[in-house]
Structures are given as C-alpha cells and as structure tokens.
Amino acid sequence: MPPKGHAILSASSSDRWLHCPPSARLCETYEDKGSNYAAEGTDAHSLCEYKLRKALGMESTDPTENLDWYNAEMEDCATGYASFIMELLEETIQACSDPVVLIEQRVDFSRWVEQGFGTSDAILISDGTMHVIDYKHGLGILVSAENNSQMKCYALGALELFDDIYDIDTVSMTIYQPRRQNVSTYEVSKDDLYQWADEVLKPTADLAFAGDGNFLCGEWCGFCKAKHECRARVEANLLLAQHDFKLPPLLTDSEIEVILSRIDELVSWAGDIKEYALQQAISGKEWTGWKLVEGRSNRRYTSEDAVSNAVEAAGFDPYEKKLLGITAMQKLLGKSRFEELLAAYIEKPQGKPTLVPESDKRPAMNTAKNDFMEEYDNE
C-alpha cells in the first residue's frame, strides 16, 4: 500500500530516480493529482489487508461498504492474495514452527535513501529467509520482482527492523498481480542486497535528493510528472525522429534495430504531448495554429428503460440474445463445471505475430523462412 505522507525519494518511484536522478526534484514542483487507478488500487489493498487478517484469525473490520471501487473481481483478487500468503505460511511452517507474519508494516530505509520510508503489504520471516510480498492491482503493466528496486527498498527497510532479531541470510521478494495472472518471485542473499544498497542505491539517492546527476530517458518516464515538458525527453525523442527523414528501405539493419528499441517510447512521448496540450487548451490556453473543437460523438438513449417500454408496447422485442463470453460463462457455471461441460469446445487460436525484444519470455514463432529451412534440412 502507498506510504502515508510524502517522500521525495519514494520506493515506488525508485526505478525512475535511480535511472534519472534529477527527476526527483523536478517532479517535486508538480501537484500530485492522483487517479482513478490509484484509488482503485487503494481500495484493493484495504480489502487484501482485511482478507489476510481474517485468514490469520485477527480482528478486522470488513471495509467493503466503504470501498468505492469494490466489485466481484476485486473480491476474487483479495481472496486469492490471502490464500497465496496462507499457502506460503503453511510451507514455511514445515521448516519453522513459529514464523512471523506482519501486515502493512511500515519500513524505513533512510540509512541509504534520505527520508526513505514505505509500507510493505506483507512480510513473512522463517528460519533464514525473509519473504516480502507486494500486491499489485494494476492491469496495464506486468510487474516483475526481478531486481525490482521498490521491493529491494522495502526489503532493506524490513532488514533494518528484523536483521538483529532473526538470523536472516536470504531475502525473497514476491509480486502478486492477480489481474495479470502474475506471481513473480526473486531471491537474493542478504549480503548481495546490502552491497547493492551501498554501491548503487545510496550514491544515486544522494544525487537525486540534491537534485544532481544526469537526465536519462527510458521506459521509467511513463510515470514521471514532468514527462510532458521534460526537455531531455524532447531532445532524445526528436533525435530518434530524425530517422523519419529516410525512407525505410534506405535504413540499415542496425538503424532499424535502434528505432525498434525506442519506438514504443517515441509513440508514448508523442501521446503524452498531445494529451498535455489538450488538457492545457481545455483549461484556457491558446496554442498558435491550433483550436479546440467538439469531437465526434455517437447517438445514445437518454433512458434505456423508457426505450424498452416503448418498443415492447409496440409489440417488438428490444433485446438481443447473445451467447455469454468465455469469462462470463465461467463465472456463471463455476470453474470446475465449466471445464466439465465446455472444455471440448474451447480453443485458443494462434496469436497475431508481434515483434518484441529478445528478452521477452515468450518463445519465438516459426516464420515461413524457418519452416522452409527445416523442411530443406530434413530432406
């Protein structure tokens, strides 16, 4: 859950300020507006906390009636989160009879990061191993625990509290992201984590807190408050855009590979600029050569009940009958009954080809050329 209070160098934004130290102070000049996604995430965390406390036999008040974003999906996600931690607890009990479980534990990692603090969703400590678990309700971005700087900051804060009490030698960090069917775990030795903190985290955090260091653009710009106006981002993307003055057939393979590695960032930047300019225009700013107009809209009913009544009174059926989609059908039947009745009628067609970095975990597709070469080799 997001920490209470304001931290210039928050763990959640550490991926950005570790790559681009000056962005920390730059973002400080912008208002924190929040978002519906953040509000939904906060509600989900509250429900997760309740579910876990209840599963552990602790007293806790059901927050459901006060959650603006509560729905059946959030209920399932929170239940799954609590079950996951209870299963992890059962596993640790096999090796340690008295593991420690902490929920919504405030952690302080200010030994390495000025004013560094946060709140860890769950911490589980057993013989030799400390588990740090973070719930992510987001759907848009798949979050990995591997070398995740936010998780490492939380782990450092947890070690500050418990390293002198328990004999910890291994830290296990887990991201639980149910809406992406993602459970990502990364283990590191305590010594390696401390080495990273001393050699990478602290020196960079000192630069960031002082507003020093060099600007650097990358995928971490996505959540930067200054991304719409950042001059370093403009210069980096305009430099890449200069390739557009060559027709693709004239580009070398290496040039195309450079563009491919940055194209998503370029598209994202262009979209950010358009959205920023639009919001400024709505607020009254006038851009030379541009004007604000009413966009296209589609007709809609002012009252669906009135439409339904009028059509039925005229002797017609206003509703279409449509087969439920797979997700809705599974909710209707239940998972086991769904598999029993419909497994034979479900298929997953091959996905549309998409070009991704080599680091992507999905296996490479066979192209027509590869298929031909395989047949040729087998002859």
Describe the role of every protein-language-model region.
Residues 1-130, 170-172, 263:
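Metal-dependent nuclease catalytic cores that hydrolyze phosphodiester bonds in DNA/RNA
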Residues 2, 46, 52, 56-63, ...:
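DEDD superfamily 3′-5′ metal-dependent exonuclease/proofreading module
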Residues 33, 37, 142-144, 252:
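Alpha-helix N-cap/helix-initiation motif
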Residues 39, 98-206:
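Mg2+/Mn2+-dependent nuclease catalytic core
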Residues 52-56, 137-140, 155-163, 206-209, ...:
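Hydrophobic/aromatic-lined pockets within catalytic cores
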Residues 195-265, 363, 367-379:
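Short, charged, low-complexity amphipathic alpha-helix
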Residues 268-379:
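Extended, charge-rich alpha-helical segments
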